[in-house]
């Protein structure tokens, strides 16, 4: 093979590599799993949905999501048979994608009322949903809630399943004074995976800012 032919072959191979579709279209598939059980009153539900919309509108979060083509979905959960994928998987390829998703998140209507708290069942549904996510390098489930279980299966089986799938489970615990067993402790001990973390909002009013910091940590892959 002549030098010119060799250069041509290398150039064609390089061009093909650059033009080939990436195996992972996105960096992170992030499923937001929101507690809407009986302990969440209507005003607290509004705080959660509005807080999610505000977090997604944060300029730093928006820049990372577009640059990394993050895939988002929202699941709401309560009792053992009560889980609903409210917003299906959406790849954030441009700012308009995120703006539309944030608007839809803020307008979500509550699917369940007067129901129990079953995070173990919620995790099972979340894992089923994340199996249908676009191909991404990382898959993360972000569980938020203000109570410990009062029904449904233990979360341990779902946590083992998540670790086998390579899915990270993180938690956002909403706690109020006098709420009994700290939700943060339950999330740390029973819910999150070994590579996961928990952040705590000390009231529902602190939810939006805590969620913003949590999502930023998840998509920026900040360690510690």
Predicted segments, located by residue:
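C-terminal "exit" segments of structured domains
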Residues: 199-224
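VWA/integrin I-like adhesion module and closely mimicked acidic/polar interface patches used
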Residues: 148-189
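N-terminal signal peptide c-region/cleavage motif recognized by signal peptidases
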Residues: 20-21
